[in-house]
Design a protein with these regions (language model features):
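Core catalytic region of metal-dependent phosphoesterases/phosphodiesterases
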Residues: 1-51
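Short amphipathic alpha-helical segments
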Residues: 1-3, 80-81, 115-118, 152
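Active-site neighborhood of phospho(di)ester-bond hydrolases with catalytic His/Asp-centered motifs
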Residues: 13-17, 69, 102-107, 138-142
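Catalytic metal-binding/acid-base residues of hydrolase active sites
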Residues: 18-19, 72-74, 107-111, 144-145, ...
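A short acidic, helix-capping loop that chelates divalent metal ions and anchors anionic groups
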Residues: 21-25, 75-79, 177-179
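His/acidic metal-ligating clusters that form di-metal
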Residues: 45-115, 199
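Acidic, His/Gly-rich catalytic cores of divalent-metal-dependent hydrolytic chemistry
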Residues: 116-199
Length: 199
C-alpha cells in the first residue's frame, strides 16, 4: 500500500537498507532477528512489480547544494552506515571534501542535525534550523513509520531552500490502529513495543 501511494504521487524516493535487502534477498550484517522477520514478511506481501520499482530506486540524489541518502554520505552503498555521535565528524569531513553543504539522511530514525559552524561542531534538535551560518550539516528529518527519539509521533522536515531554513515537524496519528494491524499480521511483540515506545 505504501509503495503504491509513493508511485501515485511521483515523489523523489531513494533506496534504503530494507529496500535493498528485500529486492536482493541479502540482508546487511547488522539485521536483527526481528529485522529479518520483517524482510520475510515483506517478501511474501510485496508484489513483483513493486519489488522491481524498489530495485530501480537511486541510492542517492544530489541537487544544487544538497545530497539525500538513506544511510551516510561517506558509505559507498549510501544506505548501510549510520550518522551518529561516533561517525558524524568523518561524515562532515566527507561533505567538506566534496563541497556539499547539506546532507539529508535517515537510517538512525532520530530527528536532528549534526553541524559545522565555523570551527564549532555538534548536534542540535530544534524545531527550526537556520542554514545561513552553517558550513556543513547532516540533517535527519526523523521517521514517519518508526521514530526512535522516544516520541511516537510521525516525524518529518521541510527544507525551504530560498529561506535557507529546515523546519522539523511531528504529527500525531492513530498508533493503536497500526498496533492492531500488526497484531493481526502476527508481528513480533518486540516490534510493537518499539513502536509504542518510540525506540
Amino acid at each position: 500500500e505504501c509503495i503504491r501511494e509513493l508511485q501515485k504521487r511521483n515523489f523523489l524516493v531513494i533506496k534504503g537498507n530494507h529496500d535493498h535487502a528485500l529486492v536482493t534477498g541479502i540482508p546487511a550484517r547488522g539485521f536483527s532477528p526481528v529485522g529479518r522477520w520483517v524482510l520475510e514478511w515483506s517478501a511474501a506481501e510485496v508484489e513483483k512489480a513493486e519489488c522491481d520499482w524498489l530495485a530501480n530506486l537511486p541510492a542517492y540524489h544530489q541537487q544544487d547544494n544538497w545530497i539525500a541518502v538513506h544511510g551516510a554520505p561517506q558509505d559507498k552503498t549510501f544506505f548501510n552506515a549510520y550518522v551518529y555521535r561516533l561517525t558524524y565528524e568523518e561524515n562532515l569531513s566527507y561533505l567538506a571534501e566534496h563541497a556539499i553543504p547539506i546532507c539529508i539522511h535517515g537510517h538512525t530514525h532520530i530527528q536532528g542535525t549534526y553541524y559545522l559552524r565555523g570551527k564549532r561542531h555538534g548536534f542540535e534538535n530544534t524545531d527550526e534550523l537556520r542554514l545561513d551560518d552553517i558550513k556543513h550539516c547532516l540533517v535527519c528529518p526523523g521517521s514517519v513509520g518508526q521514530p526512535r527519539s522516544g516520541k511516537t509521533d510521525a516525524e518529518f522536515a521541510i527544507f525551504d531552500q530560498q529561506q535557507e531554513i529546515i523546519q522539523f515537524h511531528r504529527t500525531n496519528y492513530d498508533l493503536e490502529c497500526i498496533v492492531k494491524d500488526m497484531h493481526h499480521h502476527g508481528f513480533p511483540v518486540q516490534l510493537i513495543d518499539r513502536l509504542r515506545q518510540g525506540r
